[in-house]
């Protein structure tokens, strides 16, 4: 970045507060935020006249008010297509780790310094994955990649999406489309949340909808925390009305609800610090995307990954 541009970097990689972000926006021609940097309408209103591009280091742009940026003549870009496989891998990791109690078992060995009582018929019993019904909420690139992996593990694939996928994809995955999200939730053993975070998907998995799930079912979320009513999810797990959850994202991250931490200690949930895309290869690909978008913009071309307000 420094070789190509007069770049001012967040050297210690700390999470910038709002005054720091606004100060950068007043001086910069191009801003490169991460998904935890909130670029809301108030911040955009205070941007300097030279700021013309916000090149987000991330696929999701729910941290940016894209409409407000457009009104100020500021282009927004993201880094699509490079995180699909990494995020799908993490989804499968959570999908396996919760029913099979993998983290609980690993923690037990660590706490006992490798000592355990030995095998017995009822030792660390979890739930079988093979043959279970997986309901995918959001059958885009990531949802489809999750489905391909899950099919190889013997799960039957079901999905809810704004639009039905092609007959070829349905045939390949032997996938069943559900027009009604409510009806799908009530029939699945595992729900995987893979849709984008938009105003329309805020609390898409509401208290009412989560309550439709079977008490033996699990929820997995590697998309965005705001899509699920987190408090409702916690209450149902606490009450034994839902078997558990695997979460890589949280409604108020980076803060994690203390009640979720308590459930994790009991082995009811597996919690990860939003690391679904955290691979060396993925980060390099994201950085390359950011630079390609900046160079195109600086050279007077339309950036290839421009985000339009009506697409958010």
Regions found by a protein language model. Name each.
Residues 8, 158, 226:
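Conserved beta-strand positions in the Rossmann-like core of class I SAM-dependent methyltransferases
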Residues 142:
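Hydrophobic/small residue at the entry helix of a nucleotide-binding pocket
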Residues 1-77, 186, 206, 212:
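An N-terminal-biased, well-structured beta-alpha scaffold segment characteristic
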Residues 39-42, 163-261:
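Rossmann-like adenosine-cofactor binding region
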Residues 80-133, 145-148, 159, 167, ...:
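Phosphate-binding beta-alpha-beta segment of Rossmann-like dinucleotide-binding domains, i.e.
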């Amino acid at each position: 970045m420094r070789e190509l541009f007069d770049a001012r970097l967040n050297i210690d990689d700390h999470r910038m507060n709002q005054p720091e972000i606004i100060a950068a926006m007043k001086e910069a021609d191009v801003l490169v935020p991460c998904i935890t940097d909130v670029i809301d309408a108030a911040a955009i209103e205070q941007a300097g006249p030279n700021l013309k591009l916000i090149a987000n280091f991330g696929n999701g742009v729910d941290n940016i008010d894209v409409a407000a940026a457009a009104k100020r003549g500021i282009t927004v870009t993201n880094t699509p297509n490079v995180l699909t496989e990494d995020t799908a891998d993490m989804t499968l990791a959570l999908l396996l780790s919760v029913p099979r109690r993998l983290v609980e078992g690993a923690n037990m060995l660590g706490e006992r310094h490798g000592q355990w009582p030995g095998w017995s018929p009822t030792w660390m019993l979890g739930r079988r994955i093979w043959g279970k019904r997986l309901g995918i909420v959001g059958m885009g690139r990531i949802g489809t990649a999750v489905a391909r992996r899950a099919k190889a593990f013997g799960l039957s694939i079901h999905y809810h999406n704004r639009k039905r996928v092609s007959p070829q994809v349905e045939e390949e995955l032997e996938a069943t489309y559900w027009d009604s999200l409510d009806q799908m939730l009530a029939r699945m053993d595992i729900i995987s949340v893979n849709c984008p975070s938009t105003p329309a998907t805020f609390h898409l998995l509401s208290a009412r909808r989560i309550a439709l799930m079977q008490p033996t079912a699990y929820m997995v979320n590697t998309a965005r925390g705001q899509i699920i009513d987190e408090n409702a999810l916690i209450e149902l797990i606490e009450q034994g009305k839902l078997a558990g959850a695997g979460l890589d994202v949280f409604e108020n991250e980076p803060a994690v609800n203390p009640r979720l931490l308590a459930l994790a200690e009991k082995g009811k949930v597996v919690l990860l610090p939003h690391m679904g895309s955290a691979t060396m290869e993925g980060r390099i690909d994201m950085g390359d995307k950011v630079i390609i978008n900046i160079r195109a913009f600086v050279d007077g071309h339309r950036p290839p990954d421009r985000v339009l307000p009506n697409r958010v």
